[in-house]
Amino acid sequence: MGEKRDRDVEKVYSVSEFVAKLRRLADALETGERFEIQVAGERIYVPARAEFNVEHEREGNEEEVEFQLKWTNA
């Protein structure tokens, strides 16, 4: 497989789609399995060893909360 290109994309989901993805993520975390998700046409495999954090940003009247999963590919 070739080297993956850098990318930084955001995908907007409906409430029901987002809830379904969060449920699948929670199930994967509880069972210690990897989490699969497709974002903007690319399937991503999040390993069980990933680190998780919550980030809060505020700028003027706008606020943002991000749930982040980070890992390094071996």
Locate predicted features.
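Terminal, regulation- and interaction-focused segments at domain boundaries
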Residues: 1-20, 24-25
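N-terminal intrinsically disordered, cationic/polar leader segments
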Residues: 2-8, 34-38, 42-74
